[in-house]
């Protein structure tokens, strides 16, 4: 028989998860289906005049050193990006909800560079980080700087458009060092906010299988 204190803790955890998700709604992919932690997705910026490329990929954001990698939008419109999966912070359920903490991890069997780093996203919260810190690869589940939230950013025809937020600010994009490919950063400037959609990998016709270095 399980210890009563353990059972009480599990009940409290489930109750807390219910409270945290009350009033939230499932995040939808481009087909209108809820995001599921068992599936993989391409994160694709909404196309604009200044952002007409493909999906998000890990890439070097400095000339030297290359590591840790950052995240950029591929300049090639036909490249869907590199797949990601989502891990719920509370570990309860499998549907990704708006305003709920998640960890984001790139999924790839081919990872030729920076193998000493994890594939989880994180905010550069180091003392040397600029005012608008970069999103890097090398995060750790449970760490404050590896926690992201998906917030609704569109209605009507743009109902399945979202933005990513963190404890430090909103995920945005600025011209990067390689051919000015949009690079992900944290910003409080709404003009730089990156609007994205999620495309299930099974629904895509092609996939990026290698790390992408603009240039």
Curated annotation (Swiss-Prot):
Family matches, as InterPro entries: Kunitz_inhibitor_STI-like_sf, Prot_inh_Kunz-lg
Name of the protein described by the UniProt record: Kunitz trypsin inhibitor 2
Disulphide bond pairs: 67-114
GO biological process: defense response; programmed cell death involved in cell development; regulation of pollen tube growth; response to herbivore; response to insect; response to wounding
Signal peptide: 1-23
GO MF terms, alphabetically ordered: cysteine-type endopeptidase inhibitor activity; peptidase inhibitor activity
Family: Belongs to the protease inhibitor I3 (leguminous Kunitz-type inhibitor) family.
Organism: Arabidopsis thaliana (Mouse-ear cress)
Compartments where found: Secreted, Cell wall; Secreted, Extracellular space, Apoplast; Endoplasmic reticulum
SMART domains assigned to the protein according to its UniProt record, in alphabetical order: STI
């Amino acid at each position: 028989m399980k210890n009563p204190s353990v059972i009480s803790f599990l009940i409290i955890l489930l109750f807390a998860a219910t409270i945290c998700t009350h009033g939230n709604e499932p995040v939808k992919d481009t087909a209108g289906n809820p995001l599921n932690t068992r599936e993989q997705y391409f994160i694709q910026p909404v196309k604009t005049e200044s952002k007409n490329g493909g999906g998000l990929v890990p890439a070097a954001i400095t000339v030297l050193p290359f590591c840790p990698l950052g995240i950029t939008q591929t300049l090639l419109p036909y490249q869907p990006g590199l797949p990601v999966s989502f891990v719920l912070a509370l570990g309860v359920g499998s549907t990704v909800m708006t305003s709920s903490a998640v960890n984001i991890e790139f999924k790839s069997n081919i990872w030729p560079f920076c193998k000493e780093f994890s594939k989880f996203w994180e905010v550069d919260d180091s003392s040397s980080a600029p005012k608008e810190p970069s999103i890097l690869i090398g995060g750790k589940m449970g760490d404050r700087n590896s926690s992201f939230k998906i917030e609704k950013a569109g209605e009507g025809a743009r109902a399945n458009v979202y933005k990513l937020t963190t404890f430090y600010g909103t995920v945005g994009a600025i011209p990067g060092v390689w051919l000015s490919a949009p690079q992900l950063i944290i910003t409080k400037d709404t003009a730089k906010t990156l609007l994205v959609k999620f495309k299930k990998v099974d629904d895509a016709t092609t996939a990026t299988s290698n790390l992408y270095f603009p240039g």
